[in-house]
A protein has these predicted regions:
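Glycine-rich phosphate-binding loops of nucleotide-dependent enzymes
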Residues: 2-221
Length: 221
């Protein structure tokens, strides 16, 4: 069963369920003479979970890096659908920050969090693509900037509740167990309010109990 918080607040997609959300066609990625991806193509439908399965070195992370803009394939197309009006975006030439603003969020195979910051601070960083006030106004923290941060904090608190992170809210991420850190990284991706969520081996290195918890959270999303 989906949680009320995610259905009503965190999911930014307006693509109808069952319609194409992402279309990948004939992708080829090379690093010098090494072919990482060749003739890769599939369609991701809105409201569904899709898995890319393969052995180590098969190119799974490279494919996600292409979708999120960290890599740019030499050929092929990656088309993101962002609305029920037929709006599409070609991602193969876009930088990562522009793809993130289109609603694509991801976690990484190796944890990419700020270990010296608290869980709350790491999750607030996921809201940066939605912040509209200037740095100066944010530093002074008054008027619109204050109201903006309060609104962002409210959404982050929903993510904390969704992922059962209440007990770790003010703890530095670097002091937490590995499984909790993976959960925080999922949370940071969710605070982007993604229309497309990419999870790179979200259960790697976890014990069986942590895997069960993560599977439950992903299904809730």
């Amino acid at each position: 069963m989906r949680t009320r918080a995610y259905e009503h607040t965190l999911n930014s997609s307006t693509v109808p369920a069952g319609s194409p959300a992402l279309e990948i066609r004939d992708i080829e990625l090379r690093f010098g003479g090494v072919v990482a991806l060749h003739d890769v193509g599939f369609t991701v439908t809105q409201g569904h979970i899709h898995a890319v399965i393969g052995p180590n070195g098969a190119g799974k992370s490279s494919l996600l890096n292409c979708v999120s803009g960290l890599y740019h394939p030499q050929q092929g197309s990656i088309t993101l659908h962002t609305g029920d009006g037929g709006t599409t975006h070609e991602l193969t030439k876009l930088p990562p920050h522009k793809i993130a603003r289109l609603g694509v969020a991801r976690s990484f195979q190796n944890i990419e969090l700020f270990s010296g910051l608290t869980v709350l601070e790491n999750l607030m960083l996921g809201r940066h693509t939605h912040m509209k006030q200037s740095i100066a106004a944010s530093l002074l923290w008054f008027g619109p900037a204050q109201r903006q941060e309060i609104a962002h904090r409210g959404l982050v608190e929903e993510v904390i509740d969704l992922l059962s992170l209440q007990a770790f809210r003010h703890k530095p991420v670097g002091s937490l167990a590995y499984g909790i850190q993976k959960r925080v990284e999922l949370g940071r991706a969710l605070t982007v309010q993604p229309s497309l969520l990419l999870l790179d081996e979200p259960m790697a290195g976890m014990n069986s109990e942590e895997k069960e918890d993560m599977a439950r959270y992903v299904l809730d999303v």
